[in-house]
Amino acid sequence: MAKQIRDANGKVVAELLQEEDVTSNLDGKTLAVIGYASQGRGQSLCYRDSGINTILGLRKNGESWKQALEDGWEENETLFEIPEAVKKADMIVMVIADTAQPEVYKAQIEPNLSAGKTLVFSHGFNIHFRQIIPPKNVDVSMIAPKGPGRIVREQYESGFGVPALLAVQQDYTGKAWDNILALADALGATRPGVFKTTFKDEVESDLFGEQVDLCGGVVEMVKHAFETLVEAGYNPLLAYWECHHELHGLIAPLAYKYGNVGMLNSVSLTARKGALASGKRVMDQHVKENMKACLKDIQSGKFAKEWVEEYKQYGFKKM
């Protein structure tokens, strides 16, 4: 039975689904994984080892095709070009890059879909922002592992798994939730647990985290801290050590393992006092207002629209 997750006030905010909540399997179904980069390789190997009839859909003789052959996938048996893989599959897992998906979908996947098939995504971007509009007679689901493909594979091989978010955008067959939960089980994700969400919430929260915290905010914060010390005359090596190395090598692992309070309880009293005295001075209300502005751009579709247009015009050249 699903385990309820409650906040500090006792309100149920989520339900954790684990192995005992899986009520069906994918026996008799064929799974086509489209793409063989980080997530594609990690996920497909796990599905195959879990006994699911798994095939790959790739560009023939590309680098991913060659890697797949090295990993034991066999041409015309378990390795096909994308259109043929889609024709053979009951479930199609889209794990090529977000930027490449719309063109590949339109040219090679959509013409080969038939009623009752399932499209599975690992990120909600193209569905939520309507870069891909599936027909009404297919299921549209998502399994978003909270870790890169290499870690997904390593955790699976260790007998555990990486947690994942699950969502169903379109349930034509009436079995979309059962099937995506069974797929999560085959990935090992139900061992730590999976959570139900929506395509909207997954992509908007994911983009927000990347931009204001994980990839954008942290990088700029560290950069400003480093520059402040160097501009004040401190040795750049010392500045790097204090502002970058200790964040990733000491503080982040402590916060990951023990939480923010546990991290503060693990550092010196002087460090704790400094954090409490200056943390909000640096990350003040103005910073929060900037974060809200970033979130608004994500929610309105402004960021997605600008990114899609930029990619169509320049590719990765502007990055």
Feature annotation, model-predicted:
Residues 52, 113-117, 136-138:
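A short helix->loop->beta-strand "cap" motif at the edges of active sites that frequently abuts
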Residues 2, 6-16, 234-319:
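NAD(P)-dependent Rossmann-like dehydrogenase/reductase catalytic/cofactor-binding core
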Residues 2-76:
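NAD(P)+-binding Rossmann beta1-loop-alpha1 motif at the extreme N-terminus of oxidoreductases
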Residues 199, 203-260:
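Active-site segments that bind and position negatively charged phosphate/pyrophosphate groups
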Residues 120-211:
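Rossmann-fold dinucleotide-binding core
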Residues 65, 85, 101, 236-240:
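Small-residue helix-packing motif on alpha-helices
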Residues 82-131:
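Rossmann-fold NAD(P) dinucleotide-binding segment
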